[in-house]
């Protein structure tokens, strides 16, 4: 790696670390008792096929400021929103980690671009989890138990599920952006949201092979309320 590339990466690392530190400082006061994921209605459901999954995660209506917040079981205020985001990041990271393990065992992904996507996004999603956990500190919610079925061992199912999960992440972050009070939290959320959008675009292109896969919902993103996100995630059956 040349010196310019090293410098750029160092700058990015410093920005990420600073955002996480700033966000963590906003949690210094008060305490939050977190409920279990089941209280949020996340557990249960059956694993569905890629087409049905994508259909379940299509955008709903836009939301206004102060509406569509996560259930109280995630925590109060900004803590609840970041724990809501962390739950989605846990899900995504676990999905890609399992797919990576299966890829090492069976080489189920044959397409070279999809292999690169898996490697890159696995790193990113684990970084997002670490980032949010550091920002939340002792208030971070625990990782849920998951079951991805065959979606992490079939190339076609993997790509379809990646499209669904990444687009849901984008809709979830945009849905909560106006609900965040702390500037440090807004910076943290936006730094992840933009990367999730890039993941979704690449996954969509891998799935369709057409430019339309990059922006499946058109030129504007439609925010999801927390309830819409949780309903869509529950339908996947991935969270146990």
Residue ranges, per PLM feature:
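All-alpha RGS (Regulator of G-protein Signaling) helical domain and cognate RGS-like helical scaffolds
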Residues: 2-32, 55-240
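Short, glycine/alanine-rich hydrophobic alpha-helices that insert into or span membranes
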Residues: 46-56
């Amino acid at each position: 790696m040349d010196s310019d590339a090293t410098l750029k990466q160092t700058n990015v690392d410093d920005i990420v670390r600073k955002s996480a530190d700033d966000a963590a400082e906003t949690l210094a006061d008060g305490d939050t008792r977190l409920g279990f994921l089941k209280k949020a209605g996340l557990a249960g459901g059956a694993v569905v096929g890629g087409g049905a999954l994508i259909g379940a995660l299509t955008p709903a209506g836009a939301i206004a400021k102060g509406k569509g917040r996560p259930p109280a079981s995630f925590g109060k205020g900004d803590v609840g929103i970041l724990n809501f985001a962390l739950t989605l990041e846990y899900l995504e990271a676990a999905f890609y980690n399992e797919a990576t393990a299966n890829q090492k065992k069976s080489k189920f992904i044959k397409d070279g671009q999809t292999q690169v996507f898996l490697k890159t996004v696995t790193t990113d999603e684990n970084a997002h989890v670490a980032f949010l956990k550091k920002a939340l500190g002792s208030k971070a919610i625990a990782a849920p138990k998951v079951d991805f079925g065959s979606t992490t061992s079939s190339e076609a199912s993997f790509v379809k599920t990646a499209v669904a999960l990444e687009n849901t992440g984008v809709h979830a972050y945009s849905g909560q952006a106006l609900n965040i009070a702390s500037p440090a939290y807004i910076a943290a959320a936006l730094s992840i949201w933009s990367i999730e959008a890039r993941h979704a675009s690449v996954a969509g292109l891998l799935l369709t092979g057409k430019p339309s896969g990059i922006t499946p919902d058109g030129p504007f993103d439609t925010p999801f309320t927390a309830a819409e996100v949780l309903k869509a995630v529950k339908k996947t059956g991935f969270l146990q």
